[in-house]
Amino acid sequence: MKFPNKKYINLESFYNDYFKNLNLSLSSINLSNLKKIIKILNEIYTNDKNKLIVCGNGGSAALSDHFACDHQKILYETKKFKPFVVSLVSNFSLGTAISNDVNYRSIFTEQLKQISKNKDVLLVISSSGNSENIVNALKWANKNKMITISFTGFDGGIAKKIAKINLHIESENYGIIEANHQSLINIISQYLKLRVLSNKQIKKIKF
């Protein structure tokens, strides 16, 4: 859905339409795929064998770091999970070295070659789904027997098509797409946490 598609004469109208579109786009999420992702992450966060690797560009790079931070800290605190989550954008020095010595298209693929193994999970966050480094990472991960997941927006691009599981935001607005991707990160971590806590514990802690 295209938003905005007109000029607004006051903040109130834009505010109301923004949140209307935000909620509409979140309601378009494929809940069956979300359940699959939660099941996969629950398994790797408890098996002590595999890791989650996350990546993105620009605002999605920030979401990648946020994903790693929240899932490692929030879920480990329950003592029920041992999440091993790596954001491929966290090591700025390594990223610039690969970009300079190889190329930016390979910034994620080169790191995957070094740290990934079979049945690790690659989760890419990309509004367009067409960033070349994201697409290359997905192709390499699929070829090397990783589990691949994509968070996308707009028309989903290539990442929507080639990831084994996709969560797509029906929107053509970067802000709305990225806000909903952040919501998905929170939903996944908080739901996993809720599943292992008692009602008494839930009432005592902050989410």
Placement of each model-derived feature along the sequence:
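Generic N-terminal amphipathic, Lys/Arg-enriched alpha-helix
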Residues: 1-29
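Short glycine/serine/threonine-rich phosphate/pyrophosphate-binding segments
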Residues: 60-65, 130-137, 159
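A charged, well-structured terminal subsegment
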Residues: 114-115, 122, 175-207
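Short, well-ordered beta-strand core segments
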Residues: 122, 148, 166-168
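Glycine-rich, small/polar surface segments that engage phosphate groups of diverse ligands
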Residues: 43-115
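A short, well-structured juxtamembrane/interface segment
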Residues: 29-46
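Short, glycine/polar-rich helix-capping loops at beta-to-alpha or helix-loop-helix junctions
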Residues: 150-163
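Glycine-centered short loops/turns at secondary-structure junctions
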Residues: 48-49, 119, 145
